């Protein structure tokens, strides 16, 4: 009998930071509040990397959303499930602002988050979108 697929997400500090940042981004969007408010409301301390990622995505949201809209072709950004949209935003932010993180790592982490929190199909969608976007923003 095959073993269930183990997620690679959460295997290290950076992976955990990405996951927590996506949760904060999703909550902020769902509640129509700033991500800084979500961070302030946390009982447990928020790691610096989590705050940097979540706040950075919020600052670059217009730019990331333009890229998502451009590369999603037939889908409007609002039609993309909220969790997938926020995973894409985080990954695109990293592609643009964190040149120290290899493209393959950014894409793999995003795909794993999509598979874990959305659907297998979302993982494929995220992979295709980010592969195309990476060719544009990481020349």
What is the meaning of each model-derived region?
Residues 1-123, 127-139:
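N-terminal interaction/assembly modules
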């Amino acid at each position: 009998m095959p073993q269930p697929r183990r997620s690679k997400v959460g295997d290290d500090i950076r992976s955990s930071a990405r996951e927590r940042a996506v949760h904060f981004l999703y909550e902020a969007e769902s509640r129509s509040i700033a991500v800084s408010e979500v961070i302030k409301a946390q009982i447990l301390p928020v790691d610096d990397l989590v705050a940097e990622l979540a706040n950075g995505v919020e600052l670059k949201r217009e730019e990331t959303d333009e890229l998502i809209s451009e590369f999603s072709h037939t889908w409007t950004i609002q039609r993309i499930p909220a969790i997938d949209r926020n995973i894409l935003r985080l990954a695109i932010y990293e592609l643009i602002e964190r040149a120290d993180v290899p493209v393959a790592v950014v894409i793999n982490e995003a795909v794993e988050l999509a598979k874990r929190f959305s659907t297998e199909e979302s993982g494929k969608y995220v992979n295709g979108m980010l592969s195309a976007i990476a060719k544009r923003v990481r020349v």
